[in-house]
Curated annotation (Swiss-Prot):
Pfam families: AAR2 (PF05282), AAR2_1st (PF20981)
InterPro entries linked to this entry: AAR2, AAR2_C, AAR2_C_sf, Aar2_N, AAR2_N_sf
Residues bearing PTM N-acetylalanine: A2
Biological process annotations from GO: spliceosomal tri-snRNP complex assembly
Keyword entries, A-Z: Acetylation, mRNA processing, mRNA splicing, Spliceosome
Subunit organization: Interacts with PRPF8 (via RNase H homology domain). Component of a U5 snRNP complex that contains PRPF8.
Highest taxon listed in the record's lineage: Eukaryota
Organism lineage: Eukaryota, Metazoa, Chordata, Craniata, Vertebrata
Function field: Component of the U5 snRNP complex that is required for spliceosome assembly and for pre-mRNA splicing.
Family: Belongs to the AAR2 family.
Annotated protein name in UniProt: Protein AAR2 homolog
Gene Ontology CC: spliceosomal complex
Length: 337
């Protein structure tokens, strides 16, 4: 950097009031700049001082291949030993999938940036919501939960997952239809595929992988919950397996690689001791091994079931819970006569 002429008083003021950016180990010859100024740095360069208050733009560039060689000693190589595993976990995630799902902020955080739905900064606000005063003692755990403010994600920070239906049957369905659609979720799945993935149902697998990776590497709990809900929808859609057999062949491959990344007891509910995954896959295998299903899918499902039984000692031989009598809550006003 060339020496600059500056008023001594201004220089003294900026020395104490201005900012300093420290940049260590920048290779000689690198082009470095701040705002409209840029330089090719020498061996003694360590940063910039006396930066005036305000917004600034720092930029740098390796000007040629020779300089890239100098940078080599400061760079860690990509661990290619894990590349195959990474590809297997992201094989259906396209650029369009990332653009559609990633937060508008383009940052994925383990803990959501949340705001209270209602500010309730003052006692009168709490009274308006029929909430007890903060100083009073909680009489139960549920009361304690009720006192917590309702929160919502800060706009632009949430992962934009597809909205999954909570009602699995069409409006106006008869009691018999409600029961059928509650046991076979194909109607709900087709609604998701038609609205979110028109013309390309395989893209739902990209969203399944995106959710899993966000949980596995980013520790995003909301992504794990979405992965479970989406997987449940896919595994409990018997009619859809016949229609979208190629999608389900690929689903088995995806699950094979995903389940290799987590402990066998990870999905066990600590309260009920029920294993979400075994119960969900039990229904899936029961449907996928049907004679009505494509032979390729059926054969792959049988091999996958045998693999999981051997590796995790999961029992899929027992009768699925879905074969037991199912109690279905009918919408208000639905007649059973």
């Amino acid at each position: 950097m060339a020496a600059m002429q500056m008023d001594p008083e201004l220089a003294k003021c900026l020395f104490f009031e201005g900012a300093t950016v420290v940049i260590l180990n920048m290779p000689k010859g690198t082009e470095f700049g701040i705002d409209y100024n840029s330089w090719e740095v020498g061996p003694k360069f360590r940063g910039v001082k006396m930066i005036p208050p305000g917004i600034h733009f720092l930029h740098y560039s390796a000007v040629d291949k020779a300089n890239l060689q100098e940078l080599d000693q400061f760079l860690g190589p990509y661990p290619y030993a894990t590349l195959k595993k990474w590809i297997s976990l992201t094989s259906f995630i396209s650029e369009a999938t990332v653009e559609r799902l990633q937060p508008e902020s383009r940052q994925i955080c383990a803990f959501s940036d949340v705001l209270p739905v209602l500010a309730m900064k003052h006692t009168k606000d709490r009274v308006g919501q029929n909430l007890p005063q903060c100083g009073t003692e909680c009489k139960s755990y549920q009361e304690g939960l009720a006192r917590l403010p309702e929160m919502k994600p800060r706009a632009g920070t949430e992962i934009r997952f597809s909205e999954l239906p909570t009602q699995m049957f069409p409006a106006g369905a008869t009691p018999a239809e409600i029961t059928r659609h509650s046991m076979d979720l194909s109607y709900a799945l087709e609604m998701v595929l038609g609205r979110q993935f028109p013309g390309s149902p395989q893209d739902v697998l990209g969203e399944l992988q995106f959710a899993f990776v966000c949980f596995l590497l980013g520790n995003v709990y909301e992504a794990f919950e979405h992965w479970k809900r989406l997987l449940n929808l896919l595994c409990r859609s018997e009619a859809a397996m016949v229609k979208h057999h190629a999608l389900y062949v690929n689903l088995i491959s995806i699950l094979y690689h995903q389940l290799g990344e987590i402990p066998a007891d990870f999905f066990v509910d600590i309260v009920s001791q029920d294993n979400f995954l075994t119960s969900t896959l039990q229904v899936f295998f029961s449907s996928a091994c049907s004679t009505a299903v494509d032979a390729t899918l059926r054969k792959k499902a049988e091999k996958f079931q045998a693999h999981l039984t051997k590796k995790f000692r999961w029992d899929f031989a027992a009768e699925p819970e879905d074969c037991a009598p199912v109690v279905v809550e009918l919408p208000e006003g639905t007649s059973t006569g």
